[in-house]
Design a protein with these regions (language model features):
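Sec-dependent N-terminal signal peptides
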Residues: 4-13
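Active-site neighborhood of phospho(di)ester-bond hydrolases with catalytic His/Asp-centered motifs
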Residues: 54-56, 85-88, 113-115, 146, ...
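Divalent metal-dependent hydrolysis catalytic cores, especially in the metallo-beta-lactamase
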Residues: 53-59, 71-93, 110-117, 143-144, ...
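Acidic-and-aromatic substrate-binding clefts and catalytic sites of carbohydrate-active enzymes
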Residues: 60-68, 86-96, 119-128, 155, ...
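Active-site gating/metal-coordination segments in enzymes
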Residues: 19-29, 41, 95-214, 266
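Histidine-centered catalytic micro-motifs
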Residues: 53-62, 185-189, 245-249
Length: 367
């Protein structure tokens, strides 16, 4: 028996898998390096929001057929997403068709924001024309106005001159929003790092490598600081107009500066679409910010991918530690839960949206 055991052991040793050995000269790309965490802690994945949601930042094709709308609403139900704000409403006939289709089929579940017509901006009567169209769009069911990032960054008139965010030809349109008490959700610029040198010190190096067209060199674009200066000039010019600063104004990584701006502009709010990665790496600072400004921050997601909402819920609702974000190019770091108090969570998820966006049926939400 002892001899048999001695014979088996060498065979067993020979059967062991052979692993690569460490090599100080080995090279691996940033994309390939994806280590599995050796940390074992409690995990509390969340696939459905604790309270009904109003997602104030989404984009959907307004002409989708009934079957596609039914599928969309079913997916929303799974997330506890009660109201989706479609920011891609357009203007004129397109806006009316989008409202008639989406709200006609599901009156309580969708909100449509209008967009402006940027054609013929050189025309002497453009300011009046665009304001009148917006007024008609609101009468046709638009519940807000959305500006995309091209406004200010690369929108130009025929002469080639850049249209600035605080260009006075748009003043009347912003005042129309004040008149009808509908908010303006405005997306200005992009992450600050897209405007900075693409080098080893740039925290968005990987994203710019994968998407070089997102880089904003100074010889082709205004600086990030210039664009933000124009944005806050615009917000300050219209104190009776309610603004929602998209993507936390790209200040998710500098909540101290965002705090100063919220203090300075009482008509400004902010939403969290596409900046969760910044919040999840500073949970204590973010929790304090969300608590202090609990009446000023709204929930938004931007890209419609249901599984990505789970990470938002987990960051906002749990105290989990060191878990993955869903897109490496945004965050090669781990997330930590903010564990927001229930009252703060309710305001983020739906109460602020109910207060700021007119016409949402409040009976769909708890008190």
């Amino acid at each position: 028996m002892k001899n048999a055991l001695l014979l088996v052991l060498p065979v067993a040793l020979l059967a062991q898998p052979e692993f690569p050995r460490p090599n100080k000269d080995a090279v691996m790309s940033m994309e390939d390096y994806n280590p599995k965490s050796g940390l074992t802690v409690e995990e509390h994945p969340v696939k459905r929001a604790k309270y009904p949601l109003i997602d104030v930042h989404n984009h959907q094709p307004g002409e989708m057929n009934k079957a596609a709308l039914d599928k969309l609403v079913k997916d929303m139900d799974g997330l506890n997403l009660q109201v989706m704000v479609n920011l891609s409403g357009g203007y004129g006939d397109r806006l009316k068709k989008t409202v008639d289709n989406m709200k006609g089929n599901y009156p309580k579940r969708f909100v449509i924001f209008a967009n402006l017509n940027f054609e013929d901006m050189e025309a002497p009567d453009y300011a009046d024309t665009v304001a009148k169209q917006l007024e008609q769009d609101i009468k046709n069911g638009a519940q807000g106005l959305k500006f995309f990032k091209n406004f200010g960054m690369d929108l130009r008139i025929k002469s080639g001159d850049r249209i600035k965010i605080d260009d006075p030809r748009f003043d009347k349109a912003f005042e129309i929003c004040a008149k009808y008490k509908v908010p303006v959700l405005i997306h200005t610029a992009e992450p600050r790092q897209f405007f900075q040198p693409w080098d080893k010190d740039n925290e968005r190096w990987l994203e710019l490598k994968q998407f070089p067209n997102r880089y904003r060199p100074p010889d082709k674009y205004p600086t990030w600081e210039t664009l933000m200066g124009e944005l806050y000039s615009r917000i300050g010019r219209h104190p009776k107009t309610t603004f929602i600063n998209a993507h936390l104004g790209w200040l998710g990584g500098d909540l101290g500066q965002l705090s100063k701006l919220l203090d300075k502009y009482p008509n400004m709010n902010a939403e969290v679409a596409a900046v969760l990665a910044e919040l999840g790496r500073q949970p204590r600072t973010a929790r304090a910010f969300f608590t202090k400004y609990q009446d000023r921050v709204l929930f938004g997601k931007d890209i419609w991918e249901t599984s990505e909402y789970f990470t938002y819920f987990r960051v906002f609702e749990t105290g989990d530690e060191y878990f993955d974000y869903y897109r490496k190019r945004h965050a090669f770091w781990k997330m930590y839960g903010m564990e927001l108090p229930d009252e703060v969570l309710k305001k983020l998820y739906y109460k602020n949206g109910l207060r700021i966006i007119p016409g949402i049926d409040a009976s769909q939400f708890p008190n």
